[in-house]
Amino acid sequence: MPELPEVQTVINYLNPIVSNQTILDVQVYKDKLIKNVTVNQFIEQVKAQKILNLSRKGKYILFHLANQITMVAHLRMEGKFFIYDNLKLMRNHDYIIFKLSGGQFLVFNDTRQFGTFHIVKTSELNDLKELKKVAQDPLEANFNFDRMAHLILKSNKSIKTILLDQSIVSGLGNIYANEVLFATRINPLTKGKDLTIDQVKAIFQASKKILTKAIKYNGTTIHSFKFGNNQRGSFLDFLKVHFKAKQICSICLNHIIRFKDHGRSIYCCPVCQNLTAEQLAKINLEEVEETKL
């Protein structure tokens, strides 16, 4: 699933192209992608409207329209936006097509069909149920660190699980949570309540640094994330532990390990991140060969 850097990369690509263009026509070929209104209502709300600009809330992409309506899109697992000069370029799984006044087409493609589109009044954006669940992300200028610290330090869950909870801090996802915990040398299985405030501060600072760098390199493409004209994110070249199972740790020269916790893969260095002998005895290391697709 695209995480914050990948979503921001998509926005950075689309914004200069679609902003100030008017949506002349809309075609929807997969009704279930439209969530809180009917397909006809969706088309009525966005057709003939100028796209003012795009922004982001967590992993949600916000298309702000001139009629004070915001189209809220989520890529989910495999969603992608493409810009076509003509519809001869269409490919399988192109499900929503926006014809733009500049002669181009903004196309939403989704092989898994898990993507979502909501329509909401811009003034009521924060009342949309899906967005109300989304906490601030570490790159927001007014990020409420005290709130995040309070929720982490009272939690009985592992810090890795906590960082994936979008209601506590948004945008990290599995890749960047693994990288942040390695950067801070924190054991991913440590319960939130067992961390110190200094460790939480370190997590916050590392999150900002890693997310910012990942955006600079257009996110991480491991399997299928692409943007623009099939461009790939290059932050994969800077990953320290994620997707590095059985490879050598750049710090201590021991091997990176991979195992499951609550259904999500943890990548970590058992030495640098101080996994205990008891923890290592309980986990089942995943015998998976890491392969880029």
Show which residues each predicted segment covers.
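Phosphate/anion-contacting hairpin/loop surfaces
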Residues: 71-171, 176-183, 191
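Basic, nucleic-acid-binding surfaces and adjacent catalytic neighborhoods in DNA/RNA-processing proteins
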Residues: 24-42, 55, 147, 151-293
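Gly/Gly-Pro- and Ser/Thr-rich, intrinsically disordered tail segments characteristic of DNA damage-repair
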Residues: 1-117, 125-126, 276, 288-293
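Catalytic cores of large soluble enzymes that bind and process phosphate-bearing ligands
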Residues: 2, 6, 140, 199
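A structural signal for alpha-helix termini and helix-coil/disorder junctions
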Residues: 13-16, 20, 48, 140, ...
